[in-house]
Amino acid sequence: MRDYRQSRKYTMKKLLKIFLAALLLFSFVSMTGILFVFQTFFARFDKKTGYLTYEDVEEQYDRTVFTFPSGKNNLKGYLYGEANNQGLVVLVHGLGGGAESYLAETLYFVDQGWKVFAFDCTGSFGSEGSGIGGLSQALLDLRAALDYIRKDSALKELPLMLYGHSMGGYAVTSVLNYDYDITAVVSVSGFNTPLDAMVERSSQYIGILAYLEYPFLWGYQALMYGSTAFVQAIDGINRSDTPVMIIHGEKDRSVTYEGSGIIAYRDKIKNPNVVYKTCWIRFRNDHKNLNVSEDAYLYRKEVKEGYKALSLKYHNKVPREVQSGYDQTIDALRASKLDTAFMENMNEFFESNLNNRYVNRTE
């Protein structure tokens, strides 16, 4: 009996050692994998060709270029419509893009009488930074932009509207957790927290393993951004009575409608001044196509098929000069044409709350 107990004790110790070794190996592989994911998905994004650029419209629209600090990096900012005095729309771009990726929206707001303040987030286009770092960076960069506006004698006097898409849609709502005088917010395809968005997106590639990696994602985010990593959009929305329009595509696969999207938390949002808009039309219900015209949507599909054909022809190694030549054939204005009704809906939301703001100030 004594030998049996000793043998059993030895076996348990051996199993425990194996378990601890496996746990350490899993932890090491997990942290290495997460580091790789962050370095890959949040790498630097530089300007692409084949889309609408300021050079296409510079004769019709003025623009002032400037820089402002965000942490250790200087960000590139752009001010459009300097003669407009209705208010200031601050535009925050999504992951993989820059301010110029949203030039069509910028020019639309300028045409409606707004000044527009757009900027390239850290590690994007004209801004400094070896990479974006993570989704929380957009919130830090927006705060830096708003601090810059606070110090500008002309801009700080204007009613402030926020417009953001995807990562930017998170930033413009989560920034409501802080003390800024915001008149109204439009969030398009925004997520509630960076962690939710990353776990959801990862699960589409590696399934249930994404949830096993949750503690490591949490820890890495905490190391990178501290408490900022866990700022929730819905907490910002509920913190005040700032009017917010939340727009989301029913078939969004990047930030899902009933998953990580802000709109999925609508039953937890108590702010009475929140408006929800669901996009369900076939060609305008995904993550990136909510505000484009039907013609632009169909043309973009045509362009995408052209890219696929080139990729097949050159076995996924398209020569740079061939890629550049194809880009030059793209009609950037046509590909960027917006859906007028969609844009008018947002503009009317801004204008109606602009009027309410002035009413409230006189009461």
Stretches found by the model and what they are:
Residues 132-153:
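Alpha/beta-hydrolase active-site loop
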Residues 240, 246-248, 252:
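Short beta-strand/loop motif that positions the catalytic acidic residue
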Residues 256-266:
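Short alpha-helix in the alpha/beta-hydrolase fold that links the catalytic acid
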Residues 174-226:
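Hydrolase active-site cap/lid region
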Residues 272-363:
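C-terminal catalytic histidine-bearing segment of alpha/beta-hydrolase fold enzymes
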Residues 106-128:
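Conserved alpha/beta-hydrolase
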Residues 95-108, 121, 258:
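The serine-hydrolase catalytic nucleophile loop
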Residues 15-69, 76-78, 304-326, 360-363:
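An N-terminal hydrophobic leader/cap segment in hydrolases
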